[in-house]
Amino acid sequence: MRDKISESTQKIFHAVWERIAPFHEMIQSRPAVLSYSGGKDSSILLHFYFWLWIEKKIPAPCIYHLDHSIRFNLEQEKKIFEYADSTFPFSKIFKKKNIPALSRRLGKTLEETGRAFRYKDLKKISDQYEGYIVTGHHSSDYLETILLNLIRGGGWNSLRTLGWYEKNRFRPLFAFSQEEIETILQSEFWKIFEDESNNSDEYLRNRIRSYIIPLLLREGANPDRIYKNFHRIEKPVSKIFSKKNSDHKIPSFLKIDIWVLNDLSQRERKFFIDRYLRSLNLYPTTRNFFRDLTDLLQKENSFSLENKETWFWKSTSSDLYLIPKNSPCLREFRFEPKEMVLKWNGNQKKIPPDLIPDLCPAGAKIRKNGMSIEISEILRQKEIPVPVRKMLPILRGERKVDVICLSLWDPKIGDIVADREVEILPDFQEPGV
């Protein structure tokens, strides 16, 4: 027998659906894996997705539940399964793990162990379904987590925890105000299965929830407003969508103004660089790597630094370049001889039939302004990053370099043409690249 959803709750659900518009493409195209505990928050989450499915806005989700073996209540776990099975016509994955025993073996808290196991399991399932994970965190949970992290010695990132979408985990309850959550809980008569461990003062989070949060609320703290101060709702980067649904082009590189970086504090600088990396669909820098990068920036010399995903390059006078290691500018060009089209770095150029594309060999020169100039010197002056230089195409004719194809690196930069008449046809962008 399916639960009823009142008109007032449906109005809230509709308003929330409009608020999460930046995520519509993801929600409509990929199945959700719902992390369901049986408690109040996950019950709202489950019914919200049930309503979205009834309204034909989303594909059928999958319900995931983990018995942590903390309740020692087999009867309640059985009731949770029976309720979910009889109420929601979705696929279900119910698992049991002895989290207390695993916690003792790993030397971690019950909360840390349970969270790590759940997310590892959820990741496997979401990968299998080619979907995304959904959890029931909301702004009060965020306030608890801030305090928990600060007590444990957390820094600036403690304020930015629990984002709208990160690591393929979506948290739509942040779109509900605390007042709306209370309204739903008072209006509906859905079955709630509270974990008895939530009432135990044995756990730090519970003590924060029971004693500190009420005090802050009485003093005027607003969890919704605090969360919005540190989080913006933004359209996710393209890799969360299936390839057929994504036409977003990720840049082959990004450049950060060095004067802007120099005016920032260490924390602001890391946040700024990590935001640029996110735009490239890359992970943020680690603390140790960022320290090494900062040391090099302060020396004001040219450098090239890399981690697993990215090249960080800067000349003495240039801005800081961020180049993904899978960037098209680090791959060899493609040449289509029938059309005489040269393609590289997401750009393309039609070339005259008497020229041949090639890579620049060491020591190669080009005749310019009556002088024979080393191409490496030209690339240095033009501030072409070192990792890119060996892949930048040139055009040869009569055994000499006639053109350095700088426009394929950056269309705003003109090609370098040797001192002889060479017909260079206009550049054009490759459609859809």
From Swiss-Prot:
<dbReference type="GO" id="GO:0005737">
    <property type="term" value="C:cytoplasm"/>
</dbReference>
<keyword id="KW-0963">Cytoplasm</keyword>
<dbReference type="InterPro" id="IPR012795">
    <property type="entry name" value="tRNA_Ile_lys_synt_N"/>
</dbReference>
<dbReference type="InterPro" id="IPR014729">
    <property type="entry name" value="Rossmann-like_a/b/a_fold"/>
</dbReference>
<dbReference type="InterPro" id="IPR012094">
    <property type="entry name" value="tRNA_Ile_lys_synt"/>
</dbReference>
<keyword id="KW-0547">Nucleotide-binding</keyword>
<comment type="similarity">
    <text>Belongs to the tRNA(Ile)-lysidine synthase family.</text>
</comment>
<dbReference type="InterPro" id="IPR011063">
    <property type="entry name" value="TilS/TtcA_N"/>
</dbReference>
<keyword id="KW-0819">tRNA processing</keyword>
<keyword id="KW-0067">ATP-binding</keyword>
<protein>
    <recommendedName>
        <fullName>tRNA(Ile)-lysidine synthase</fullName>
        <ecNumber>6.3.4.19</ecNumber>
    </recommendedName>
</protein>
<comment type="function">
    <text>Ligates lysine onto the cytidine present at position 34 of the AUA codon-specific tRNA(Ile) that contains the anticodon CAU, in an ATP-dependent manner. Cytidine is converted to lysidine, thus changing the amino acid specificity of the tRNA from methionine to isoleucine.</text>
</comment>
<dbReference type="GO" id="GO:0032267">
    <property type="term" value="F:tRNA(Ile)-lysidine synthase activity"/>
</dbReference>
<keyword id="KW-0436">Ligase</keyword>
<dbReference type="Pfam" id="PF01171">
    <property type="entry name" value="ATP_bind_3"/>
</dbReference>
<dbReference type="GO" id="GO:0006400">
    <property type="term" value="P:tRNA modification"/>
</dbReference>
<dbReference type="GO" id="GO:0005524">
    <property type="term" value="F:ATP binding"/>
</dbReference>
<feature type="binding site">
    <location>
        <begin position="37"/>
        <end position="42"/>
    </location>
    <ligand>
        <name>ATP</name>
    </ligand>
</feature>
